[in-house]
């Protein structure tokens, strides 16, 4: 039987919509049950306080979860499943909707793909002449603070797909999204390499912990 604490977030969602739930209520809705002597709302509040935010929670590994009372393997699996569902949702949405509808959608997709990665990943979205998504690929992976990017490989893949434009993105596992000098230099190299084949670089987004930097928004592209 559902407890009162379990029903409260559910009834609020049905009455006012899922967006009306606080982070604690949303987490409680997914956890469903508390632990002996601790209701689910209290457990959800303590978990969020421990990790600082939903981002910190969903990007944590099992070793970090084990330090929280009430979080076992089952609840860890539930929460990691939520993060993976979000990642797959945005991936499918990009493929099915075919076009980048807005900068916000692009950012949300890239955050879903790159947030929580422990190494730097360089991802490229390939677009046709109408800016419809042809493919998105993780072309390069690196270390905690560096990824080797080869502009010619980006151009080669774009030509193979008959792409007329690309959006570049990579993550900073450190959490700070501010671009380094190396980030700016590689962006310039990719732009120059693409220009030879009449391929436009629309943006380069750097994804940090709960933040991002868009080269286009800053007027660098």
Curated annotation (Swiss-Prot):
Keywords: Hydrolase, Metal-binding, Metalloprotease, Protease, Zinc
GO molecular function: metal ion binding; metallopeptidase activity
Signal peptide (from-to): none
UniProt binding sites for Zn(2+): 170, 172, 183
Record Pfam families: RadC, UPF0758_N
Short motif (JAMM motif): ranges: 170-183
Domain MPN: 99-221
Name under which the protein is recorded: UPF0758 protein YicR
InterPro entries named in the record: MPN, RadC_JAB, RuvA_2-like, UPF0758, UPF0758_CS, UPF0758_N, UPF0758_YicR
HAMAP family (UniProt xref): UPF0758_YicR (MF_00018)
GO biological process: proteolysis
Gene symbol of the encoding locus: yicR
Family: Belongs to the UPF0758 family. YicR subfamily.
Source species, domain of life: Bacteria
